[in-house]
């Protein structure tokens, strides 16, 4: 009978949330909480110019809005990121291609590790310029490549 009564007392104790505090101590907490970063999708606009075969001609532009907390942005071709050169390849005939470079609004060539100084919420445009020397006849068609957009914070 004593065992049953003891069990009933313990359950009654838990049911009423009664507890006895033995001791308390403060412990410092240090943690880093970082904000998730979602890169905005750039808008890529092709050039419909007549002179795309000329050296320095605009092939396409990359427009984007700079996210919060970003101090530098770069856009560079995946094809040869070390030299900042891209290669647009005709989807119908892979032997036809255009070598290009990307520059910022001031004409500075963009590379993987070198970006343009920016401020948050700024609209910025990068230009892909024909890097082929002289003038080359460009066949009409769809030309593909890939570019990377890099965001940097200080």
Curated annotation (Swiss-Prot):
UniProt KW keywords: Fimbrium, Signal
Nucleotidyltransferase among keywords: no
The protein's role, per its UniProt record: Fimbriae (also called pili), polar filaments radiating from the surface of the bacterium to a length of 0.5-1.5 micrometers and numbering 100-300 per cell, enable bacteria to colonize the epithelium of specific host organs.
Protein name, per record: CS6 fimbrial subunit A
Taxonomy, superkingdom: Bacteria
Gene Ontology CC entries for this record: pilus
Cellular location(s): Fimbrium
Protein encoded by which gene: cssA
UniProt-listed Pfam families: CssAB
Position of the signal peptide: 1-18
Organism: Escherichia coli
The keyword Ribosomal protein is annotated on this UniProt entry: no
């Amino acid at each position: 009978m004593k065992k049953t009564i003891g069990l009933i007392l313990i359950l009654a104790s838990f049911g009423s949330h009664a507890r006895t505090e033995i001791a308390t101590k403060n412990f410092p907490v240090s943690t880093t909480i970082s904000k998730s970063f979602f890169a905005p999708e750039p808008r890529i606009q092709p050039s419909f110019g007549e002179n795309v075969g000329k050296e320095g001609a605009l092939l396409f532009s990359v427009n984007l809005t700079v996210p919060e907390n970003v101090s530098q942005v770069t856009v560079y071709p995946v094809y040869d990121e070390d030299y900042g050169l891209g290669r647009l390849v005709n989807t119908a005939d892979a032997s036809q291609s255009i070598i290009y470079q990307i520059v910022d609004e001031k004409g500075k060539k963009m590379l993987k590790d070198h970006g343009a100084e920016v401020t948050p919420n700024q609209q910025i445009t990068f230009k892909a310029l024909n890097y082929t020397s002289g003038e080359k006849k460009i066949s009409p068609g769809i030309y593909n490549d890939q570019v990377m957009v890099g965001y940097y914070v200080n």
